[in-house]
């Protein structure tokens, strides 16, 4: 190809060059057609035929890219039932028109403002991953055209969201979000299947309540936390009171047992004398060498009970 011309232009130029050469020679060769106007007419006819053949060859093929499928619309019979896979295929120019569909899954976000069972307004966004049913492409083209997803998905997603959300309270949309998403997915898949649309994934990506409801929920949470804190303080005070009662009872019982032990035997008194003297000596040792004071047995408290015994 020279000068960036198309095959059709190149063939037309060659034919015109051949026709001019034949005209200069006075016809289409010895023993052929006579020259003159008749030869020029035949050259022009050949040029037209060759140009038409080049046009047909250039427009008789169409390609189907990866992830796509194609159908044909015929001027006589309408939409054909054949579905063409990826690759190059033959088509009759003017008589047949190829229609290509992208059959890969495409994401779409649909936002909806709807009301809950307890009449709270909620903004909810649903993300849908959809693709056409390949076997039903002719029917999709007849009923919906090539922009089938734009015609169908926004309306059915809004309808399903409103019907499902109306079954739950506002708080349940948060605590039972998985159940809500499951119901939306099941209902939406059934509705889309009626239009020959397959859904690979349906998820709730955004959930927002009105500012008033959000403030009320926060206030309720704060009140619950304060109530729990107050209950904890009361329970702690009750436990401390019980601990003090138990301690007092234990000390009273201990004093009673000590009194009985003293009455029965003097050995307990002697043991207390020794423990008291040991404690005093340890305290004096830890205080260091300064202000050292020497005490006898009376100062150490070893004679605590001697006067009582003498009396």
From Swiss-Prot:
It is a single-pass type II membrane protein. Disruption phenotype: Abrogates mitophagy. Defective morphogenesis of mitochondrial cristae; cells are sensitive to menadione (generates reactive oxygen species in the mitochondrion) and the mitochondrial membrane potential is affected. Decreases formation of secondary hyphae. Decreases colony growth and reduces conidial production. Decreases virulence on A.thaliana. The keyword tRNA-binding does not apply. A motif (AIM) lies at residues 141-144. It is found in: Mitochondrion inner membrane. PANTHER family: PROHIBITIN, PROHIBITIN-2. This is Prohibitin-2. It comes from Colletotrichum higginsianum (strain IMI 349063) (Crucifer anthracnose fungus). The lineage of its organism: Eukaryota, Fungi, Dikarya, Ascomycota, Pezizomycotina. The gene is PHB2.
